[in-house]
């Protein structure tokens, strides 16, 4: 154990952006690590974390820094609300599960909700998404029940408890539908989702990606307009964490793996063709290089980006730090999600 601790201290001390995020210098990393090990050392926490599939480096590279930000925010803000954004497949749900466990270890009780929970019921959602050229009826702006989401955030801010709808992706042959609701109580609200914090953007001639059809370009512009409806929701958040892939094409590989797990569990899952169309729809609806810009200072009362993290193709953390410390994937890589090349992704 002493040798393992020494190696970990050495590895963490070399990560300049990681230390900047946590306000540490090389000399204080060892003492900081000992405090975290004390907090995480109970059998209950160890067993709960072991039950969450993750790469070993994710604990110290992503999970602990994020829960430290949450703890810091909780000390200064009553009933804080934070957003967690990342393209499909980055492991936001897993990260949310980890925050629920780690929050308890650090002395607070987070409510973890997904923007997917707030999808409109299928008939209403299908009607709202009828103009979608990808024939996908969940995911893009306009498919969420913003009235319920805003009510959840406001009820939590006022009372520390709220109602969150449940969405079952396995219903309706993989299209998914609402399945009741759950009452939650806590002292921190974490909202995760692929488009959390996304803002209206000015679409250019190569948006959403080079080679897009006229219908896809029109859909992209429409979704940008619809993002204006989400602005008041994002203003209810105190900060954002962005988790991004090293290359945009990793997202399809991760979603293929997720659908395979869904299929093995006996639940409805999307076919390969449906999945390609879904990912292409996501990119056309909210191009992350346009709608999520971590270095842009909010001027509309929106939440600031507090932390960014980059994952490689195996979901290993390769960089983490404050905005500007992590490289943003080049917009040109978005062409990997275009109709002509999406089948070769991954």
Residue ranges, per PLM feature:
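Walker A (P-loop) phosphate-binding loop of P-loop NTPases
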Residues: 89
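Short hydrophobic/aromatic beta-strand immediately N-terminal to the Walker A/P-loop
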Residues: 83-85
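Hydrophobic positions on the alpha1 helix immediately C-terminal to the Walker A/P-loop
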Residues: 95, 99
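Conserved nucleotide-sensing/catalytic segment adjacent to the nucleotide-binding pocket
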Residues: 53-54, 111-114, 118-172
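Phosphate-binding/switch loop-helix module in NTP-utilizing enzymes
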Residues: 152-198
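N-terminal pre-Walker A segment at the start of P-loop NTPase domains
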Residues: 49-74
């Amino acid at each position: 154990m002493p040798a393992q601790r020494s190696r970990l201290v050495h590895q963490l001390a070399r990560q300049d952006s990681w230390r900047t995020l946590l306000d540490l210098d090389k000399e204080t990393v060892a003492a900081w690590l000992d405090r975290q090990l004390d907090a995480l050392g109970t059998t209950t926490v160890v067993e709960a974390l072991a039950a969450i599939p993750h790469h070993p480096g994710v604990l110290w590279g992503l999970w602990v820094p994020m829960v430290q930000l949450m703890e810091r925010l909780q000390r200064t803000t009553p009933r804080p609300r934070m957003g967690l954004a990342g393209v499909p497949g980055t492991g936001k749900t897993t990260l949310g599960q980890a925050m629920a466990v780690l929050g308890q270890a650090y002395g607070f009780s987070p409510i973890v909700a997904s923007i997917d929970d707030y999808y409109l019921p299928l008939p209403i959602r299908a009607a709202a998404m009828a103009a979608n050229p990808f024939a996908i009826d969940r995911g893009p702006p306009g498919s969420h029940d913003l009235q319920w989401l805003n009510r959840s955030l406001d009820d939590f801010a006022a009372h520390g408890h709220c109602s969150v709808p449940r969405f079952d992706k396995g219903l309706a042959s993989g299209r998914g539908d609402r399945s009741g609701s759950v009452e939650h109580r806590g002292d921190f609200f974490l909202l995760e989702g692929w488009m959390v914090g996304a803002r209206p953007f000015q679409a250019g001639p190569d948006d959403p990606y080079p080679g897009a059809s006229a219908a896809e370009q029109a859909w992209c512009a429409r979704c940008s307009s619809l993002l204006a409806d989400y602005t008041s929701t994002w203003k209810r958040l105190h900060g954002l964490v962005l988790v991004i892939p090293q290359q945009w094409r990793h997202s399809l590989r991760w979603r293929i793996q997720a659908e395979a797990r869904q299929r093995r569990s006996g639940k409805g899952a999307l076919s390969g063709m449906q999945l390609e169309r879904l990912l292409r729809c996501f990119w056309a609806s909210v191009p992350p290089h346009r709608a999520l810009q971590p270095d842009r200072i909010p001027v509309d009362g929106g939440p600031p980006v507090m932390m960014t993290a980059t994952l490689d193709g195996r979901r290993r953390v390769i960089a983490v730090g404050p905005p500007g410390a992590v490289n943003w994937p080049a917009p040109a890589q978005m062409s990997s999600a275009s109709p002509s090349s999406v089948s070769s992704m991954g």
